[in-house]
């Protein structure tokens, strides 16, 4: 969906816009869950289609890294295509989805005391500190903090110029600049952290390895924001 919306921006070809709108409608129809008690929006990990065509919604992740959790990055990237489409259409339904998903981030993923956003929450307790989260308990990482900007947040701010999104951008970038660089030990950023922002260099496959693309994302998005907000 993001690709189709971006292709329309580059070419003006209506078939790309049509695809982006249809893709957004599909995501809203098949992958969105509205909590009627809180008004917040969650996005499903996926859905299974049975032999008879029946649909089974999957809220918790089935990926090994995030198994049986709700990972922040899945909620973050659910907004990527729709928000790029919103920049083109101004569809108020998309903006409403974004606002209610950000409410979810602020309520359950955000660490209001020490800053940043937790990487995973439990699907029932909605706590980042639930023991059943295992190695993902009370953790923060590049995805949960830094991916807001490239996935949807800069585009949402450009589309609306609302202070809420500008403040969130500034906060996430300040958090990245404060905690992620590790120049005394590496030219690459530190990517995974414990609750108190101490380094987690023993997690799963990553250990103390760098992801080069994440470093490029940081530089790219810091400069994007710098260009419009010196």
Predicted regions mapped to residue ranges:
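Glycan-recognition and catalytic cores of secretory/periplasmic carbohydrate-active enzymes
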Residues: 1-230
């Amino acid at each position: 969906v993001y690709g189709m919306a971006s292709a329309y921006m580059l070419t003006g070809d209506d078939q790309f816009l049509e695809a982006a709108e249809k893709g957004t409608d599909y995501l809203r129809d098949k992958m969105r869950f509205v909590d009627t008690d809180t008004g917040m929006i969650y996005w499903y990990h996926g859905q299974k289609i049975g032999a008879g065509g029946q649909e089974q919604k999957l809220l918790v992740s089935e990926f090994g890294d995030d198994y049986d959790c709700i990972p922040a990055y899945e909620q973050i990237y659910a907004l990527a295509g729709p928000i790029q489409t919103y920049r083109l259409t101004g569809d108020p339904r998309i903006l409403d989805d974004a606002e209610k998903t950000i409410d979810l981030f602020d309520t359950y993923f955000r660490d209001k005391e020490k800053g940043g956003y937790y990487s995973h929450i439990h699907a029932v307790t909605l706590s980042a500190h639930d023991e059943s989260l295992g190695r993902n308990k009370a953790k923060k990482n590049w995805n949960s903090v830094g991916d807001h900007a490239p996935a949807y947040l800069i585009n949402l701010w450009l589309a609306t110029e609302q202070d809420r999104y500008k403040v969130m951008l500034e906060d996430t970038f300040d958090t990245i600049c404060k905690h992620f660089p590790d120049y005394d030990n590496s030219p690459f950023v530190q990517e995974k952290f414990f609750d108190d922002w101490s380094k987690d260099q023993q997690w799963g496959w990553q250990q103390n390895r760098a992801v080069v693309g994440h470093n490029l994302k940081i530089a790219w998005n810091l400069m994007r924001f710098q260009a419009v907000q010196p």
